[in-house]
């Protein structure tokens, strides 16, 4: 599958897996980002969220996807199932240790004054997330209009240039990989396992 002006590049994954970090890399690499910048940077995402509000209503409204052609948009994994087969997609799917995801979400909630559900609930949520990810991976494999590259959050932090080259190869070898790698700040990696 080649990337062209009609291809929609999607950054996906669970929340708190590095999707905003990947959007930042792709923007630095030269891609056009589809974002409205309504949700601004904060303590939880110091470099911004790169979200597009219309994504939240993807289930009921896909008309905005025409504006995404030739661009990159962030869509959480739960919403991928609502992407119509009438477009071609290149999906950069972010992966991260589930316990780190949960720890990051807990910290985000605490900063907003909401208590964590606790360790027992974290194990249950981890099982739900693992099941969702397995089902999503299986679903993506069956979609001829979608090609997916899986990128590990920790691998990006450990070797940003190597991962930037993988992403560039997947997206057609037209990105500035050095600039992509230069935007990675390992100091923002706060929830480790």
Would you name each region that the model predicts?
Residues 72-175:
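PAPS-dependent sulfotransferase catalytic domain
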Residues 37-39, 55-61, 78, 104-108, ...:
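A generic structural micro-environment signature
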Residues 1-69, 183-193:
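PAPS-dependent sulfotransferase catalytic core
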Residues 35-38, 148, 172-183:
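Short, surface-exposed acidic
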């Amino acid at each position: 599958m080649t990337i062209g002006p009609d291809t929609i590049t999607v950054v996906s994954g669970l929340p708190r897996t590095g999707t905003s970090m990947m959007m930042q890399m792709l923007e630095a690499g030269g891609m056009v980002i589809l974002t409205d910048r309504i949700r601004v940077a904060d303590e939880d995402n110091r470099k911004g969220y790169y979200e597009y509000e219309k994504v939240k209503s993807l289930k009921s409204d896909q008309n905005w996807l025409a504006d995404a052609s030739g661009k990159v948009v962030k869509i959480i994994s739960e919403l991928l199932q609502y992407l119509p087969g009438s477009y071609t997609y290149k999906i950069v799917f972010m992966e991260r240790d589930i316990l780190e995801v949960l720890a990051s979400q807990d910290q985000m909630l605490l900063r907003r004054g909401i208590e964590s559900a606790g360790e027992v609930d974290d194990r249950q949520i981890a099982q739900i997330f693992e099941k969702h990810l397995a089902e999503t991976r299986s679903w993506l494999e069956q979609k001829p209009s979608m090609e997916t590259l899986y990128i590990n959050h920790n691998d990006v932090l450990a070797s940003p240039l190597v991962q930037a080259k993988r992403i560039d190869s997947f997206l057609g070898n037209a990105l500035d990989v050095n600039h992509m790698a230069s935007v990675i700040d390992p100091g923002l990696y706060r929830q480790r396992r």
